[in-house]
Amino acid sequence: MLSLFNRLPWLHRVLITAFSAIIVFAIFFLPNSEDLRKPDAQREVGRHYPVTLDNQLVSTPEEEVIAPPSVMLRWETYQVANGESAALLFQRAGLSSRVLYELTSSNSDINNQLSKLMPKDELKFGFDKDNQLVQLKRTISPYETFVVTRSDSGFTSEFDKKEVTFQLNYAEAKITSNFWNAGVTAGLSANQIIELANMFGWDIDFALDIREGDQFKLLYQEKIVEGSVIGRGNIIAATFINQGSTFTAILDDNTGNYYDQNGRAMKKAFLRSPLDFRRVSSNFNPRRLHPVTGQIKAHRGTDYVAPVGTPIWAAGDGVVEKSSYNQFNGNYVYIRHSNTYITKYLHLQRRLVKTGERVKQGQTIGTLGGTGRVTGPHLHYEFLVNGIHKNPRTVELPQAQSLTGKAKETFIANAKQRMEKLERYSQLLYANQ
């Protein structure tokens, strides 16, 4: 039998050996029919059985979120021109009056925003692929935007406000030419320069009293939106050294007014200067030469040179005692502030108040001019105490109401902290120089 197998071709012998091995494996290792019919091979309906799956073969998406399709908008920005209404602007943007009507009739906020447009305001229009208005935006401030969105029921609106935080900043300067230039050099805005002058305007005449070498320091707020500075806030503490005298002003958060370290009001009953600080032609001098006659004539007041038409302010609350004209004073206004004080304003271009009228401190009572006996346009200002002429720059002025009681205690504690911060910032600045 073996000799017969050996006489077979080589390929046949290999195939016979392979098939024989398969048959032997099947006999000894595969289950028989009885094993297949055993209960553990059967599955009951409704029963859960553990199943092992290869994680590589089965993929399970992790919380897949299907977002609604977003609408890509084409944005166009339009700036309101002088004298342009919402209707004209919408027409320029290619929108019909019907769209404007739909917007303004949707709610009062939309109507108010579109009816109060001012020159240089910007409107942003968002159009879809069919050129239909989907969204409208109006920037109210760097941190607030009015947003209108089309919905199934018409237009809806909301005020999108960004969170505003505050940080402190510091500035200082020494005056070398004039106060305004010193403020600019210190990095202050025009509003801050004016605010600083207003804070100390009851103690310092910024038109006459400023000298080379005067200096100031201030601590002020900066508005922060999304990490960027978008504007300036209040000045919270400041010092001003004028001709060797130091003045201090600190903001009271409750009243919004400024006081010194002891809670005394910076505001006085009278302003030192009845107009914006400008170049002046003469100081208080009771024995000056008259500009026309050349004779010695008492010059019981102060002359302020400024552009014709500059607003002139009432130095304090009072009643207009006289508003008239004569060949010497030109247009003039006298104001009685009490039985003690009278202020006079001469050579006005225009008088804006009448005799008997009540006026408030800072109210415009006229404009600077050159009427009457003058060599050039200017304001002549006089300050009388019990009928006697006083230098308005140096006369002691009555104070406005100061803080008392608990309000004073709270303010003094806060004032101490703010002045300490002011000094720390000053020291840090010098340490880094």
From Swiss-Prot:
Activity control: Reduced activity in 0.5 mM EDTA and a complete loss of activity at higher EDTA concentrations.
The family this protein is said to belong to: Belongs to the peptidase M23B family.
Membrane topology: Single-pass membrane protein
CDD domains membership: M23_peptidase
Official protein name in the record: Peptidoglycan DD-endopeptidase ShyC
Domain of life: Bacteria
Annotated organism of origin: Vibrio cholerae serotype O1 (strain ATCC 39315 / El Tor Inaba N16961)
Keyword terms of this UniProt record: Cell inner membrane, Cell membrane, Cell wall biogenesis/degradation, Hydrolase, Membrane, Metal-binding, Metalloprotease, Protease, Transmembrane, Transmembrane helix, Zinc
Function: Cell wall peptidoglycan (PG) DD-endopeptidase. Hydrolyzes peptide cross-links which covalently connect adjacent PG strands probably to allow insertion of new glycans and thus cell wall expansion. Degrades purified whole PG sacculi in vitro.
Binding residue positions for Zn(2+): 299, 303, 380
Main location: membrane
Transmembrane segments: 10-30
InterPro entries linked to this entry: Cell_wall_metabolism_enzyme (IPR050570), Csd3_N2 (IPR045834), Dup_hybrid_motif (IPR011055), OapA_N (IPR013731), Peptidase_M23 (IPR016047)
Entry GO CC: plasma membrane
